[in-house]
């Protein structure tokens, strides 16, 4: 059932009306927004429907919204849910488009310069462009993003000034259209028609807009007038509909008008002269020669093509900012009255605070040793105080708000009652001495009735040992750790839900934003070791992973009860008591969460393709930093593996190894091998 609200462009799909604490939470948050509160906190327990509450607040407020999540996995989950709540509105996804990213760096101790190397996910790049397009074009927009939103992208005013507006009966020559598309960084290719490409056949120009995944536009000119505009399917060529106007957006966020580029080139030349004078005065001749050679090459590319590799390092000059000013980011594209929701704020807020310094220390080496001009330091993420200054009205969303939210919340809205009547898990404390044997017997009980178990340990070593031990005793177990990429992590969670295995072992499971209704037991080993992984907030988050199951239980293995444990157990008991009282008062019988098992990043990643691209990019980067001796060893090893594969008739494997070998030999000998 769809519902609409006065003066709101959103149509909210409401499968059921708000229940439990949701109606009160929605009303109080809307009241806070109307009263002009800058910050509010939604303290919502696991399984209380925080995402549904957010969707209701967005629909009732009727303003564009930005939802920031701590990682790609959670962002994908939120994006999928928001698309279900707002199927007729613009729900967009803005995360880092790198499947793999090796930033430019210099290691002075080894005199080693590492070139920037990356593997860009085309589909996510298209979604990022679609996100900024929606923000510029419409009010009914919800953007789900990660901390990637605080990194510099092109200036909104430059980006907007480069838009090509096509209207029926407008006067426009074929040459003018082609020139404009070239300025917008579209490539002409009459053979391979893909995103960011146009093709020309006489007076017919086909354009595949960079922000569209499945629609292209055909422009038919007659006597230097736009005669007709048709949307068509780029794969089949089938005409979809005739339109009277169409807006083509630039193919990159870094696109810049020609006059701005020429102005920037002059400013870069001035900075280069000043920097070279400084190097000569300090007798740093190698650095001076290196900087001049690299910068002049970039300037030549910018004069000829309008852009160069690593153009983002000149973003300060291109946007006309002063030294030290913040770069334009996604937040600059937001409307002035937009709303911001920071999901899992206890993690996300600290992430935002940590980005600037890590980026700065890497770039300082590049500047000191003549690889980049000092202005490259201004191609950076926002500092925390700059982010604060740009924040629109904000709602922090967390089950365990941190100190920052407590200090900044105009009001704290609690959502402790679950509409399903589910009660917080029973928390038990058991001795450490017998923790592994006790865990084994608990696991067997749960597996026998088709339930799943999460186990969290303190160290990687212990997680690996425990996984091996459980596997030896016939338990179907997997191990989740930081080396597993986003796509594989999502698949492991999906496999656990499907019953491919029964026990998932990890170190910091709470970070993964796990939403697994099938989990009935969470076991926390060494719960009495005070520290980040066993703080009150971490314990509450981890205990909450069992809160979506009727028989949810959390076992804390400890020889003493620490202050953090005491507070976490006390808070869980308080929430249990409130839910039980609500259930009794309203005659509710708790029922488990039934959630369709689907790939939560459907439409965001092609899992197999992403994994293959990522692996190839990582291997290539690994080869580039190897010395000659290591490369020779690797060549011999791969040659042997290739011959063995061919002997065993594994020809596909042999072909992959052959390609790796060609790449290695090209690196080793500096030439491509001929067939």
Swiss-Prot record:
UniProt keywords, alphabetically: ATP-binding, Cytoplasm, DNA damage, DNA excision, DNA repair, Excision nuclease, Nucleotide-binding, SOS response
Domain Helicase ATP-binding: 31-419
Residues of the Helicase C-terminal domain: 435-601
Domain UVR: 632-667
Residues the record lists as binding ATP: 44-51
GO cellular component: cytoplasm; excinuclease repair complex
Signal sequence, start to end: none
A Gene Ontology biological process term: nucleotide-excision repair
CDD domains, A to Z: DEXHc_UvrB (cd17916), SF2_C_UvrB (cd18790)
An annotated Gene Ontology molecular function: ATP hydrolysis activity
Chief place where the protein resides: cytoplasm
InterPro entries on file: Helicase/UvrB_N, Helicase_ATP-bd, Helicase_C-like, P-loop_NTPase, UVR_dom, UVR_dom_sf, UvrB, UvrB_inter
Pfam families cross-referenced by the UniProt entry: Helicase_C, ResIII, UVR, UvrB, UvrB_inter
Subcellular location: Cytoplasm
Motif placement: Beta-hairpin: 97-120
Domains as described in the record: The beta-hairpin motif is involved in DNA binding.
Function text: The UvrABC repair system catalyzes the recognition and processing of DNA lesions. A damage recognition complex composed of 2 UvrA and 2 UvrB subunits scans DNA for abnormalities. Upon binding of the UvrA(2)B(2) complex to a putative damaged site, the DNA wraps around one UvrB monomer. DNA wrap is dependent on ATP binding by UvrB and probably causes local melting of the DNA helix, facilitating insertion of UvrB beta-hairpin between the DNA strands. Then UvrB probes one DNA strand for the presence of a lesion.
Binding partners and assembly: Forms a heterotetramer with UvrA during the search for lesions. Interacts with UvrC in an incision complex.
Family per record: Belongs to the UvrB family.
Protein name: UvrABC system protein B
Organism: Thiobacillus denitrificans (strain ATCC 25259 / T1)
Organism phylogeny: Bacteria, Pseudomonadati, Pseudomonadota, Betaproteobacteria, Nitrosomonadales
């Amino acid at each position: 059932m769809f519902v609409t609200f006065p003066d709101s462009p959103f149509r909210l799909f409401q499968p059921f009306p708000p229940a439990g604490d949701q109606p009160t939470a929605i009303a109080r948050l809307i009241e806070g927004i109307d009263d002009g509160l800058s910050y509010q906190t939604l303290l919502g327990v696991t399984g209380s429907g925080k995402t549904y509450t957010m969707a209701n607040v967005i629909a009732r407020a009727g303003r564009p919204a930005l939802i920031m999540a701590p990682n790609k996995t959670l962002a994908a989950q939120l994006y999928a849910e928001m698309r279900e709540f707002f199927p007729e509105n613009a729900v967009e996804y803005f995360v880092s488009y790198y499947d793999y990213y090796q930033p430019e760096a210099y290691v002075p101790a080894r005199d080693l310069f590492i070139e920037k190397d990356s593997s860009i996910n085309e589909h996510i790049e298209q979604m990022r462009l679609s996100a900024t397009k929606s923000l510029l074009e419409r009010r009914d927009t919800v953007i789900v993003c990660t901390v990637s939103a605080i990194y510099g992208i092109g200036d909104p005013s430059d980006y907007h000034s480069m838009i090509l507006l096509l209207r029926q009966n407008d006067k426009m020559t074929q040459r003018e259209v082609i020139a404009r598309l070239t300025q917008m960084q579209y490539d002409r290719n009459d053979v391979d028609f893909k995103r960011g490409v146009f093709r020309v056949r006489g007076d017919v120009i086909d354009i595949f807009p960079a922000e569209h995944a499945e629609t292209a536009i055909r422009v038919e000119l007659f006597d230097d007038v736009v005669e007709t505009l048709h949307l068509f399917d780029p794969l089949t060529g089938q005409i979809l509909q005739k339109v009277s106007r169409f807006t083509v957006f630039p193919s990159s966020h870094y696109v810049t008008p020609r006059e701005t580029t020429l102005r920037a080139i002059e400013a870069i030349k001035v900075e280069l002269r000043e920097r070279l004078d400084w190097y000569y005065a300090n007798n740093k001749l190698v650095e001076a020669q290196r900087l001049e050679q690299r910068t002049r090459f970039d300037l030549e590319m910018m004069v000829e093509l309008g852009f160069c590799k690593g153009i983002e390092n000149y973003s300060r000059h291109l946007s006309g900012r002063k030294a030290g000013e913040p770069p334009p980011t996604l937040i600059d594209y937001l409307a002035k009255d937009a709303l911001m929701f920071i999901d899992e704020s206890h993690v996300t807020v600290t992430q935002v605070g940590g980005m600037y310094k890590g980026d700065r220390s890497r770039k300082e080496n590049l500047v000191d040793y003549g690889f980049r001009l000092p202005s490259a330091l201004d191609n950076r993420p926002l500092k925390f105080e700059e982010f604060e200054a740009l924040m629109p009205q904000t709602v922090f969303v967390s089950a365990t708000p941190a100190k920052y939210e407590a200090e900044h919340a105009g009001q704290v809205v609690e959502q402790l009652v679950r509409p399903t009547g589910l009660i917080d898990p029973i928390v038990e404390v058991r001795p450490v001495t017998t923790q592994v044997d006790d865990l084994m017997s608990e696991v067997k009980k749960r597996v026998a009735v088709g339930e799943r178990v999460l186990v969290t340990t303190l160290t990687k070593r212990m997680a690996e040992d425990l996984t091996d031990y459980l596997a030896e005793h016939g338990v179907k177990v997997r191990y989740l750790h930081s080396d597993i990429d986003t796509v594989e992590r999502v698949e492991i969670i999906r496999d656990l839900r499907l019953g491919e295995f029964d026990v998932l072992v990890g170190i910091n499971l709470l970070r993964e934003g796990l939403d697994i209704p099938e989990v009935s037991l969470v076991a926390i080993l060494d719960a009495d070791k005070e520290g980040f992984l066993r703080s009150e907030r971490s314990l509450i988050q981890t205990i909450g992973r069992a809160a979506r199951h009727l028989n949810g239980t959390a076992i804390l293995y400890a020889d003493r009860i620490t202050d953090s444990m005491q507070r976490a157990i006390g808070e869980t008991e308080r929430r249990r008591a409130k839910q039980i009282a609500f259930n009794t008062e309203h005659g509710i019988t708790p029922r488990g969460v039934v959630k369709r098992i689907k790939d939560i990043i459907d439409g965001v990643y092609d899992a197999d393709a992403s994994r293959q691209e990522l692996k190839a990019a990582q291997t290539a980067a690994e080869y580039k930093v190897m010395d000659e001796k290591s490369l020779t060893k690797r060549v011999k090893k791969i040659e042997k593996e290739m011959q063995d594969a061919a002997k065993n008739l594994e020809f596909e494997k042999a072909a992959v190894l052959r390609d790796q070998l060609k790449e290695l030999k090209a690196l080793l000998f500096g030439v491509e091998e001929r067939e």
